[in-house]
Swiss-Prot record:
Subunit structure: Component of the mitochondrial ribosome large subunit (39S) which comprises a 16S rRNA and about 50 distinct proteins.
Protein name stated in the entry: Large ribosomal subunit protein mL41B
One annotated Gene Ontology cellular component of this protein: mitochondrial large ribosomal subunit
GO MF, one example: structural constituent of ribosome
Keywords: Apoptosis, Cell cycle, Mitochondrion, Ribonucleoprotein, Ribosomal protein, Transit peptide
Signal sequence, start to end: none
Major place of residence: mitochondrion
GO biological process: apoptotic process; translation
Family designation: Belongs to the mitochondrion-specific ribosomal protein mL41 family.
Cystine connections: none
Locations listed in the record: Mitochondrion
Transit peptide: 1-13
């Protein structure tokens, strides 16, 4: 910081709200580097080494001929479609197939795996009904 800045800071009464925020000024949970991925590492001598594999690469699809625009106006009318419910999802995906099997008399309640029913969720990464965890 320059000399003039230090003099001006000394003349101002009250809290210094224009000072830069450092880890000493914030709470214990304050981390200056939070929110950005590291793209390298610091050596023991303090030099930063950039690692090419750690740099994020954004893959953007080719949007030539794409009709939609990336901006939705706040003046746009609200959607008219009803929100998705469990019953609506069931009737759109599995319902017609079960109705067809009921009409053909080939429906068996013990053979629900045919329609995508999973009796257990063992081995799944995301469980539908996880147990309550201790907080």
């Amino acid at each position: 910081m320059g000399l003039i800045t230090k003099i001006a800071r000394g003349l101002v009464r009250g809290a210094d709200r224009m000072a830069e925020c450092t880890s000493k000024l914030g709470p214990n949970s304050y981390n200056k580097g939070r929110g950005a991925k590291k793209i390298g590492y610091l050596t023991s001598s303090g030099k930063f080494v950039k690692v090419r594999e750690m740099v994020p690469v954004f893959v953007v699809p080719d949007l030539t001929g794409f009709k939609l625009k990336p901006y939705v106006s706040y003046k746009a009318p609200p959607g008219t479609e009803d929100p998705m419910t469990a019953k609506k999802l069931f009737m759109e995906t599995v319902g017609p197939q079960i109705e067809k099997d009921l009409q053909e008399s080939t429906f068996r309640p013990e053979d629900l795996e045919k329609y995508g029913f999973e009796p257990t969720q063992e081995g799944k990464l995301f469980k539908l009904f996880p147990r309550n965890y201790i907080q």
